[in-house]
Curated annotation (Swiss-Prot):
It is found in: Cell membrane. Keywords: Cell membrane, Membrane, Transmembrane, Transmembrane helix. The lineage of its organism: Bacteria, Bacillati, Actinomycetota, Actinomycetes, Mycobacteriales. GO terms for cellular component: plasma membrane. The chain crosses the membrane at residues 23-43, 65-85, 152-172, 181-201. Residues 96-115 are annotated as: Disordered. The keyword NAD does not apply. It is a multi-pass membrane protein. InterPro entries: DUF2561. This is Uncharacterized protein MT2253.
Length: 214
């Protein structure tokens, strides 16, 4: 398990897992931003198709509507980033509550008999409990990271498939049937690969949880 998740350890030659998570979340946001723009372009093309191809070529509102939607979506995403960072800082600022098992055991009678032997005998379970708590905390962090990355990757795949569908709709509306069917095929391939993404991350979760349950 340590070798499987050795990339989570800090080091000079290893990228921080937090940086990787932020890159994945940013890429996911960019995918959905692109989907917003392409879907608006497809909707405008369909409306122009209802009026006729000649009006679509001379309609000056198409570009401005598309740019306005992209700018508004970008502002929403940029405004959400400080909120997420503030929530993360508040979560990190909360003091970690750890059980005070060592102090409770230390209050027992150690003075009678052999104090040194009893102190060593009672410190062994305390050290074992501390090691177990550290391992459980590390395992919980790994599980949370797998959940986050799996959700982000699956959401990005859904966004890519929707981009392909919106692009295919736009291409078919403007009369490019060949590229449109290619885009539909790409959307089908991405959709077919979504269960594989879920299976891969569920497999990683089982690898992390299995040693703790045994």
């Amino acid at each position: 398990m340590v070798s499987r998740y050795s990339a989570y350890r800090r080091g000079p030659d290893v990228i921080s897992p937090d940086v990787i998570d932020r890159i994945l979340v940013g890429a996911c946001a960019a995918v959905w931003l692109v989907f917003t723009g392409v879907s608006v372009a497809a909707a405008v093309a369909l409306m122009d198709l209802g009026r006729g191809f000649h009006e679509m070529a001379g309609n000056p509102h198409t570009t401005w509507v598309l740019y306005a939607v992209i700018v508004v979506s970008a502002l929403v995403i940029v405004g959400a980033i400080p909120v997420l960072l503030r929530a993360r800082r508040m979560a990190e600022a909360e003091p970690a509550t750890r059980p005070t098992g060592a102090s409770v055991r230390g209050g027992r009678s150690i003075g009678s008999g052999h104090p040194a032997k009893r102190a060593v005998a009672e410190s062994a379970p305390v050290q074992h409990a501390d090691a177990f708590e550290v391992a459980a905390e590390w395992s919980s962090e790994a599980v949370d990271r797998i959940w986050l990355r799996g959700t982000v990757v699956l959401t990005s795949a859904i966004g890519i498939a929707l981009i392909a569908v919106a692009a295919a709709t736009y291409l078919m509306a403007v009369g490019h049937d060949g590229p449109s069917w290619i885009s539909y095929g790409l959307a089908g391939v991405v959709t077919a690969g979504m269960p594989v993404i879920e299976w891969l991350y569920a497999r990683q979760l089982r690898r992390v949880v299995a040693p703790q349950s045994s």
